[in-house]
Design a protein with these regions (language model features):
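Generic cytosolic/nucleocytoplasmic N-terminal low-complexity/intrinsically disordered segments
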Residues: 1-2, 43, 78, 152
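Bacterial Sec-dependent N-terminal signal peptides
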Residues: 1-22, 178
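Generic structural signal for short, solvent-exposed loop/turn connectors between secondary structure elements
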Residues: 13-22, 29-34, 85, 160-165
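A generic alpha-helix preference that emphasizes hydrophobic side chains
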Residues: 14-16, 36, 133, 171
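Short glycine/proline- and aromatic-enriched beta-strand/turn motifs that initiate or cap beta-hairpins
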Residues: 19-73, 175-177
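Outer-membrane beta-barrel transmembrane domain signature
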Residues: 66-178
Length: 178
């Protein structure tokens, strides 16, 4: 994991010296969870390959075990803008890493005399978490000015090396390119 992040940082920093379109956006849902701010840049021009780095806030709850989670994440994405003018098909792959606080009420069946009694037990803490996502969307982006994006991000979470969650996360983004 550290090698992947280190390689990503080396590649993106080497490319920053080239002329490219950059944008800053307010992101709602998608890889941001609830909301986030991201910086996007093309490797060259206003289309083709680029990257997206952000800061996001996520919050979620579950109903079966009174589960809740919230925290700050850093979405990283490599993407491709297909289209020559201002309208683009966005295709991308990425990962969100973050620190999250969680709490859960689980119900444990007791032993011995309490065999039929269900006792609530609360678990809480802070943990590092991550997910992987794809990006399929539309982006309106001029070389300078208003930018808008909308789409779907198929998202996968893991536990002990196995997929334990998958969602189709819609997203919206509004910002400015420069």
């Amino acid at each position: 994991m550290k090698k992947v992040l280190f390689s990503f940082l080396i590649i993106t920093s080497a490319i920053l010296a080239q002329a490219q379109t950059k944008s800053v956006t307010l992101d709602l849902l998608g890889s941001s969870g609830i909301a986030g701010v991201s910086f996007d840049s093309r490797f060259k021009g206003n289309h083709g390959f680029g990257y997206n780095v952000g800061l996001s806030y996520a919050y979620g709850t579950g109903t079966l075990s009174s589960y809740s989670v919230n925290g700050i994440g850093i979405p990283l994405e490599i993407n491709y803008l297909l289209g020559q003018r201002n309208s683009h098909l966005v295709l991308g792959l990425g990962m969100t890493n973050g620190i999250y606080k969680y709490s859960a009420n689980s119900f444990i069946i007791g032993y011995g005399d309490d065999a039929t009694e269900i006792k609530p037990e609360e678990t809480s803490g802070t943990a590092w978490g991550y997910n992987f996502f794809g990006d399929i969307g539309y982006r309106f982006q001029k070389e300078k000015g208003f930018t808008f994006g909308a789409g779907i991000k198929p998202t996968f979470t893991f536990d002990n090396g196995k997929i334990n969650g998958r969602w189709l996360m819609p997203y919206l983004g509004f910002g400015i390119s420069f």
